């Protein structure tokens, strides 16, 4: 199996991580190992890379791609568990951590995974195939109000109520089994005028269901906090996001870690004792260049934010 994936903001990530040749680095979303491969090129044999992915197929493909390197440790897990993983591996503090929060090109293109609204496939969307919750469960068994909330909150979809209503009405006759069936329902729910404008009409709903299935936003907050605690002083964390919800979480969490003081604004001095943990390197997120977007259109919505441990 070939795990096809074009790494997004590759040069910007490598530069942003400020790699030390003998350092220890963690790729929390190993995927096609594009970023990891570049990190390893910048490491000596004393340096080390830890690659984490919850997708076993991604791990297998990455280990094949990186087989010439002996300084790589692979871990089948979710980066939610980064603190436990590093304790288990007894590596202590690390010099850099990377998170690429996008669905890989392989996962989008592999029909059986059910991530794409462009191909007909079973409703799945699990990053980790061993997870019990899948898209079929969400679409067919969540009640209408819960579905509407997920589509509105996670997909930022203005027609969330109509879409959830159409889904519930459709499944009363027959369970919704494929991505193609779901796309047709979404298209019927969205007024024609709005279907013709902007991105694919199913994009936001599919994003929302994927986030729910994989618990992506709940995981992210804790993972950033634990990652920063796992960094050495001067170590950096670089995070690539692909939609505004994720970017907002990263932006706000970095701000909170840079200025954690909870004292009232009119207090002359801080008495809460909460000290800054990071310095934000990217006041504004780094976007892909026009050239990168032309080569890889999927990079269009990517944003990179970087912070350094104090």
UniProtKB/Swiss-Prot annotation:
GO CC term, one of those recorded: cytoplasm
Signal peptide: none
Subcellular locations according to the entry: Cytoplasm
Enzyme type, top EC level: transferase
Pfam (any one): Methyltransf_5
InterPro entries assigned: RsmH, SAM-dep_MeTrfase_MraW_recog, SAM-dependent_MTases_sf
Swiss-Prot/TrEMBL keywords: Cytoplasm, Methyltransferase, rRNA processing, S-adenosyl-L-methionine, Transferase
Any one GO biological process: rRNA base methylation
Catalysis performed (reactions): cytidine(1402) in 16S rRNA + S-adenosyl-L-methionine = N(4)-methylcytidine(1402) in 16S rRNA + S-adenosyl-L-homocysteine + H(+)
Subcellular location, principal: cytoplasm
Enzyme Commission designation: 2.1.1.199
Domain of life assignment: Bacteria
Positions contributing to S-adenosyl-L-methionine binding: 33-35, 53, 79, 100, 107
GO MF annotations in UniProt: rRNA (cytosine-N4-)-methyltransferase activity
Protein role: Specifically methylates the N4 position of cytidine in position 1402 (C1402) of 16S rRNA.
Family that this chain belongs to: Belongs to the methyltransferase superfamily. RsmH family.
Protein name: Ribosomal RNA small subunit methyltransferase H
Originating organism: Clostridium tetani (strain Massachusetts / E88)
